[in-house]
Amino acid sequence: MLSSAELIETTADRLSAYHAGHIVADPVLAASSGKKLIRDDAIDYLKNRLFPIAELITPNIPEAQLLSGISVRSKKDRIRCAQWLYETYGCAVLCKGGHDKETADDLLYADGAYRWFPGKRIEQPNTHGTGCTLSSAIAANLAKGFDLPSSIERAKDYTTHAIAFGLNLGAGSGPLHHAFDLNSRFAANARQEHNNITLN
């Protein structure tokens, strides 16, 4: 998480120096609790240094409104907001819908066009780190060679399951269960090994 202008500038410099590809920037401006996570002067550095070298930025609705100055009250507003961000910063924009009360649909604006990615809303208190998980999963899939739409689809599927299997750790909002699929694969492998032993 880049909370200061100095951190953002250093990160942007290093990414440019190493010619990094598939940069996904999640502008973490505030926590779901409302707590501010970035200094005011750092927002300009996000806009001017990090966004222009990113392949994709992934603001949620409140962040998209803050970055664009456009009020989002409908899907049409969200399209207009994402288009403004795309045209202003020259990168693809995934406007996340987790803060929408009715749906969890995400909006991608890229290459001059938009596309909706339907999402399933899950009633789960343990959602700490959802946005970071989604953006990291998108970056991982881009690094594997998947195109942007496929990377988003795969990342949304992974994140949805990680939310569904969220970990209940003490009080407050717990984290997602990032290893949910790893555990299931281990279980499947163990069953297969057991069956092989039984058959032999």
Which positions does each model-derived feature cover?
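Conserved phosphate/ATP/ADP-binding segment of small-molecule kinases
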Residues: 40-114
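Short, small-residue alpha-helix embedded
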Residues: 65-66, 124-148
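Short pre-catalytic strand/loop immediately N-terminal to key active-site residues, enriched for Gly-Thr
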Residues: 114-128
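Glycine/small-residue-rich loop that forms an oxyanion/phosphate-binding "nest" at active or ligand-binding sites
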Residues: 1-49, 59
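Residue-level signal for inorganic ion chemistry
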Residues: 26, 60, 96, 131, ...
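Short, charged, surface-exposed loops that flank catalytic or proteolytic processing sites
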Residues: 71-78, 143-153
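Charged C-terminal helix
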Residues: 149-200
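Glycine-rich beta-alpha junction loops
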Residues: 29-31, 97-101, 121-123, 156-159
